[in-house]
Amino acid sequence: MAPEVLPKPQMRGLLARRLRFHMVTGFVLSLGVAALYKVGVADKRKKAYADFYRNYDAMKDFEEMRKAGIFQSVK
Amino acid sequence: MLPKAAWSLVLRKGGRGRRGMHSSEGTARGGGKTPRYTNCYAQRHYPMPEEPFCTELNAEQQALKEKEKGSWTLLTHAEKVALYRLQFNETFAEMNRRSNEWKTVMGYVFFFFGFAALVIWWQRVYMFPPKPITLTDEWKAKQLQRMLDMKVNPVQGLASRWDYEKKQWKK
């Protein structure tokens, strides 16, 4: 090999650098995933239930089911 | 059971690696040499094997080994490289080189997926018995109609996707 001089590699602080990178990344990703879950899943679900029950009429629902013939106790 | 790391150590070290650790039987062997298994060379997980790569040295190499016993600052660069090559089969860069083996492996994997698929297709045509009554299309249609009548999961699930006025799936 030709005797060219390579730059001296990083000799110290390797674990510290790795830990810092991974801790920061882990923190950011965890917060991001939690935030996305809250918005995309949890809040969406709460809204769907609220919208469903806002104008829900249980007796009307029951009558529809009864007419469809699924009950054994009432026809 | 042994943890996975221990198993890989057991499997990869080969005969020589394990026995070479404890015994003087290696050095006492003298004339005969145990055959070198391919996985006795240095690997990333086994970087310092007991035996050097070259054990039979010619006169020049013997002289170099004698010089190595003195101060290392007296060795030239070429001599240091020669000593490294005597001790080790490959440098770290050579040992860790990439290969195209993964393409071969994936090829075989997909080939056998396809082969298995053909075998199962043949079985479906010639061997399978008729479906149970609950898996026939008529039964499944009646089952779905009953689920919609019962309004199964009306908030976010099945019945929420059905338009009860128009009697069709919501767009």
Swiss-Prot record, chain A:
Mitochondrial matrix side: 1-13
A biological process from GO: oxidative phosphorylation
Keywords per UniProt: Membrane, Mitochondrion, Mitochondrion inner membrane, Transmembrane, Transmembrane helix
Membrane topology, Mitochondrial intermembrane segments: 55-75
UniProt subcellular location: Mitochondrion inner membrane
InterPro entries, per database record: Cytochrome_c_oxidase_VIc, Cytochrome_c_oxidase_VIc/VIIs, Cytochrome_c_oxidase_VIc_sf
Disulfides per UniProt: none
One of the Pfam families matching this protein, by short name: COX6C
Topology of this chain in the membrane: Single-pass membrane protein
Family affiliation: Belongs to the cytochrome c oxidase subunit 6c family.
Subunit structure: Component of the cytochrome c oxidase (complex IV, CIV), a multisubunit enzyme composed of 14 subunits. The complex is composed of a catalytic core of 3 subunits MT-CO1, MT-CO2 and MT-CO3, encoded in the mitochondrial DNA, and 11 supernumerary subunits COX4I, COX5A, COX5B, COX6A, COX6B, COX6C, COX7A, COX7B, COX7C, COX8 and NDUFA4, which are encoded in the nuclear genome.
PANTHER family: CYTOCHROME C OXIDASE SUBUNIT 6C
Role description: Component of the cytochrome c oxidase, the last enzyme in the mitochondrial electron transport chain which drives oxidative phosphorylation. The respiratory chain contains 3 multisubunit complexes succinate dehydrogenase (complex II, CII), ubiquinol-cytochrome c oxidoreductase (cytochrome b-c1 complex, complex III, CIII) and cytochrome c oxidase (complex IV, CIV), that cooperate to transfer electrons derived from NADH and succinate to molecular oxygen, creating an electrochemical gradient over the inner membrane that drives transmembrane transport and the ATP synthase.
The protein's name in its UniProt record: Cytochrome c oxidase subunit 6C
